[in-house]
Structures are given as C-alpha cells and as structure tokens.
C-alpha cells in the first residue's frame, strides 16, 4: 500500500481549532473528505482542504490512482508561537500568544478486496 503526504506549515491558526475538524475526515475517501471540508464554515477547513489538495497533486505526480485514495491520517502539530503585547490599565501589558500550526495529510491507496 503506497502512501503519499503533504504538509502545510506555519499556518496562523491554533492547532486546537484545526484538530476539531480533522477527526471528521480521517478514513474517508478523498472526494468525501473534500466535500465535507468545503461545507464547513471554519477558517481551518479551508487550510486543511488546501493541504489535502496538495497531497492529491503529489499522488498524481507519483502516478497513483487518485479516485482510489483514502485519507489515512491527518496530523496537526503546533508550530512556533508569536508573542505580542496588549496595553492594559495602569501602564501594564499582557501577553497575547498567536499560535501557529503544521498540518500533515497522509493518503493511501484503497486496499483492493479479493
């Protein structure tokens, strides 16, 4: 079973927000996964869809059957955190953490039933 993957790195969205979405597409065919993501209203859905389309393009480069691909796994890891400050009362400042994510999509060919 041949596998192909694609990674989208340094995306400006928190990994916790993206992880909620990816559980809905794991194990589905690529076509069903894309349809599911297309109708989600979240910002992260568009980012995962872009990574999924990139993985499909990588599969085409490897001459794999695109119609028989299944989403084997989707990993969402935390990237570097951007630290910013917001002015507060009495001359103080509080830290704002702007989190980033790395999304890895792994596709595999569907196992043929004998």
Swiss-Prot record:
GO molecular function: rRNA binding; structural constituent of ribosome
GO terms of biological process kind: translation
CDD domains xref list: Ribosomal_L22
GO CC annotation terms, alphabetical: cytosolic large ribosomal subunit
InterPro entries found in the cross-reference section: Ribosomal_uL22, Ribosomal_uL22_bac/chlpt-type, Ribosomal_uL22_bac/org-type, Ribosomal_uL22_CS, Ribosomal_uL22_sf
Keywords: Ribonucleoprotein, Ribosomal protein, RNA-binding, rRNA-binding
Pfam families from the UniProt entry: Ribosomal_L22
Source species, domain of life: Bacteria
Keyword Ribosomal protein attached: yes
Subunit organization: Part of the 50S ribosomal subunit.
HAMAP family, alphabetized: Ribosomal_uL22_B
Matches recorded under PANTHER family: CHLOROPLAST 50S RIBOSOMAL PROTEIN L22-RELATED (PTHR13501), LARGE RIBOSOMAL SUBUNIT PROTEIN UL22M (PTHR13501:SF8)
Protein's job: This protein binds specifically to 23S rRNA; its binding is stimulated by other ribosomal proteins, e.g. L4, L17, and L20. It is important during the early stages of 50S assembly. It makes multiple contacts with different domains of the 23S rRNA in the assembled 50S subunit and ribosome.
Family: Belongs to the universal ribosomal protein uL22 family.
Name this polypeptide is given: Large ribosomal subunit protein uL22
Origin species: Desulfosudis oleivorans (strain DSM 6200 / JCM 39069 / Hxd3) (Desulfococcus oleovorans)
């Amino acid at each position: 079973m041949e596998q192909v993957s694609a990674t989208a790195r340094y995306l400006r969205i928190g990994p916790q927000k993206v992880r909620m979405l990816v559980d809905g597409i794991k194990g589905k065919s690529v076509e069903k996964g894309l349809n599911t993501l297309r109708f989600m209203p979240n910002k992260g859905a568009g980012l995962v869809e872009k990574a999924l389309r990139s993985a499909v393009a990588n599969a085409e480069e490897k001459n794999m059957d695109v119609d028989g691909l299944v989403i084997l796994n989707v990993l969402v890891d935390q990237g570097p955190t951007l630290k910013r400050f917001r002015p507060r009362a009495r001359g103080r400042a509080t830290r704002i953490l702007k989190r980033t994510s790395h999304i890895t999509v792994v596709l595999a060919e569907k196992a043929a039933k004998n």
